[in-house]
Amino acid sequence: MENAKMNSLIAQYPLVKDLVALKETTWFNPGTTSLAEGLPYVGLTEQDVQDAHARLSRFAPYLAKAFPETAATGGIIESELVAIPAMQKRLEKEYQQPISGQLLLKKDSHLPISGSIKARGGIYEVLAHAEKLALEAGLLTLEDDYSKLLSPEFKQFFSQYSIAVGSTGNLGLSIGIMSARIGFKVTVHMSADARAWKKAKLRSHGVTVVEYEQDYGVAVEEGRKAAQSDPNCFFIDDENSRTLFLGYSVAGQRLKAQFAEQGRIVDADNPLFVYLPCGVGGGPGGVAFGLKLAFGDHVHCFFAEPTHSPCMLLGVHTGLHDQISVQDIGIDNLTAADGLAVGRASGFVGRAMERLLDGFYTLSDQTMYDMLGWLAQEEGIRLEPSALAGMAGPQRVCASVSYQQMHGFSAEQLRNATHLVWATGGGMVPEEEMEQYLAKGR
């Protein structure tokens, strides 16, 4: 972006200056509305989410047999919700900032099959595509026991079709493993940020991995192009897919059930704050949408991004969405948080969700490494760097009197609050890689 343009952008949006300087930045969104007001802009409804629930239930008998690690939950891919009181104390000590309320962790990092939040959206979209093909071919009805999809005739049928996706790692992992298991030929276009172990794991499942020297946006574009030339190839579009988004949104009702099981209350007197790491935006956008449908105006969602990849904060704050990238303002999009190394946000997610998100913040790689170490020490939970992005959120909220006043929170409401950090990945990181992460914390 030439200087004159850049200067006028900064004059209009002074916060951009802090982003360019790679400062850890927090922006509380003045444009938030009620769910009733913001929902029409999403373009999806509660019924769409219910349909996704129903589809995952139909596939549960299949998943329970195809992936024995899901048998205990009857083929439902869901993660634990745990309190992390020792980490809460450690954060308060390190940052000299009390966190009022209780700190919880949602362990999507340990979801079965692919060990990340992408096991929600990625697997769901592959299943939705497989169902559509099998229904159209007359091989399946909605009333069938879907475990029949494990038969050789279905494997044979699906092998005529292929799936392509562009990814920094975790989405590729979930889509690759699921597609290969069901019988599709699958190609994952991996950006330069993708970890070597993720590529190796995919190849071990018979997935074709195409590697790029460039970032996520290029990998997606190349994947899209490659798929266009083959009518039997289905491209899963992380930037624009409503299906992926709905796969993530199912998490809302499921979390509501987990809260009820644990006797946790969310209402006007007991607000819920949720902190979601954000790459291109599909995962956190879908989850936040589901949470809003489940808890209404009593849930407050925040997106967390690396200082080197603040694409969603930049897009929503300036209103330019996918018309601007972090590279346009001179930021390199290089971060240890490989799952969040995205320079241009999803325009679909930004426009759909901008009224339903309370805020956005950035944190440095070093901050993620530090918190990764603290969590391992205090709670014995090991995550990958991206998954710690949410962990900085509770301090930002508890330290901001202006945010609390903007929403009219009383001291008592804050004392009764629940702060939920969404841990997005790390359950499958190899031991030696994890040791390297732990060594970088202070």
Swiss-Prot record:
Database matches in PROSITE patterns:
DEHYDRATASE_SER_THR
Q: Which InterPro entries match?
A: D_Ser_am_lyase, Ser/Thr_Dehydratase, Ser/Thr_deHydtase_PyrdxlP-BS, TrpB-like_PALP, TrpB-like_PALP_sf
> Recorded E.C. number(s)?
4.3.1.18
Q: Which cofactor does it need?
A: pyridoxal 5'-phosphate
**Catalytic activity, as annotated:** D-serine = pyruvate + NH4(+)
Q: Which domain of life is it from?
A: Bacteria
Alphabetically list the UniProt keywords: Lyase, Pyridoxal phosphate
- What GO biological process, any one, is recorded here? isoleucine biosynthetic process
Q: Which GO terms describe its molecular function?
A: D-serine ammonia-lyase activity; hydro-lyase activity; pyridoxal phosphate binding
Sites of N6-(pyridoxal phosphate)lysine modification: K118
Cross-referenced Gene3D superfamilies: 3.40.50.1100
Instruction: State the oligomer form and interacting partners.
Output: Monomer.
Q: Which PANTHER family match?
A: D-SERINE DEHYDRATASE, THREONINE DEHYDRATASE, MITOCHONDRIAL-RELATED
What's the protein here called?
Answer: D-serine dehydratase
Organism of origin is Escherichia coli O157:H7
